[in-house]
Swiss-Prot record:
Subcellular location: Secreted; Target cell membrane
Name used for this protein in its record: Complement component C8 gamma chain
Activity control mechanisms: Membrane attack complex (MAC) assembly is inhibited by CD59, thereby protecting self-cells from damage during complement activation. MAC assembly is also inhibited by clusterin (CLU) chaperones that inhibit polymerization of C9.
Pfam families: Lipocalin
Matches recorded under InterPro entries: A1-microglobln, C8G, Calycin, Lipocalin_CS, Lipocln_cytosolic_FA-bd_dom
Organism annotation: Mus musculus (Mouse)
GO cellular component, one term: membrane attack complex
Annotated glycan sites: N41, N158, N173
Role this protein plays: Component of the membrane attack complex (MAC), a multiprotein complex activated by the complement cascade, which inserts into a target cell membrane and forms a pore, leading to target cell membrane rupture and cell lysis. The MAC is initiated by proteolytic cleavage of C5 into complement C5b in response to the classical, alternative, lectin and GZMK complement pathways. The complement pathways consist in a cascade of proteins that leads to phagocytosis and breakdown of pathogens and signaling that strengthens the adaptive immune system.
Signal peptide (residue range): 1-20
UniProt superkingdom: Eukaryota
Length: 202
């Protein structure tokens, strides 16, 4: 049985690679996320605040096998200089957990790196499309595989936003069968000190 930390790690990261294996980088190849354009004139100040995770497109085997364990997930973002301090909240066995991360500045607005203790190397993240007020589409890459996430400020989700997300998923060479939709109820926003995972580099 997976430990609570392991379950949180996989469900929060939701990348499409096997994190326990080292992926060889083909000579002369480019990183998949390098072809993804960040939101034009991205503003961390406008992006700050609360986001609700709606769906993830990924070929991750863990998602296919453990998707039934998905829980409502909330993300809080706050600018920290050129970086962003991020806290993710979700329940596990009825208890609210918090994962703290720092999305580090890469020098390109809308592009970030963050560290995860169980991953081999940094995770790349791009805010590809957002209107700041209603939705945001994020790409993550670890192990040279992409996952696509849809966040919203509030529910329900506009059909036009879902159309944009599904198009982005297809463009990432993923199928609709590889989309996991998260619960729309049961969100939590606070965790006690015993249920906080701190992934911020020290």
């Amino acid at each position: 049985m997976l430990s609570p930390g392991a379950v949180l790690f996989f469900t929060l990261l939701l990348t499409a690679s096997s994190l326990g294996q080292r992926t060889r980088k083909p000579i002369g190849s480019t990183s998949p996320i390098s072809t993804i354009q960040a939101q034009v004139n991205f503003s961390a100040q406008k992006f700050a605040g609360t986001w609700l995770l709606v769906a993830v497109g990924s070929s991750c085997r863990f998602l296919q096998e453990q998707g039934h364990r998905a829980e409502a997930t909330t993300l809080h973002a706050a600018p920290q200089g050129a970086a962003m301090a991020v806290s993710t909240f979700r329940k596990l066995d009825g208890i609210c957990w918090q994962v703290r991360q720092l999305f580090e500045n890469t020098g390109v607005p809308g592009r970030f790196l963050f560290q995860v203790s169980r991953a081999r190397g940094p995770v790349h993240m791009v805010v590809a499309e957002t209107d700041y007020q209603s939705f945001a589409i994020l790409y993550l890459e670890q192990g040279r595989k992409l996952s696509v996430k849809l966040y919203v400020r509030s529910l329900p989700v506009n059909d036009s936003v879902l159309d944009v997300f599904e198009r982005r998923v297809r463009e990432a060479n993923l199928t609709e069968d590889q989309i996991l939709f998260f619960p729309k109820y049961g969100f939590c926003e606070t965790a006690d000190q015993l249920h906080i995972l701190n992934e911020v580099p020290r």
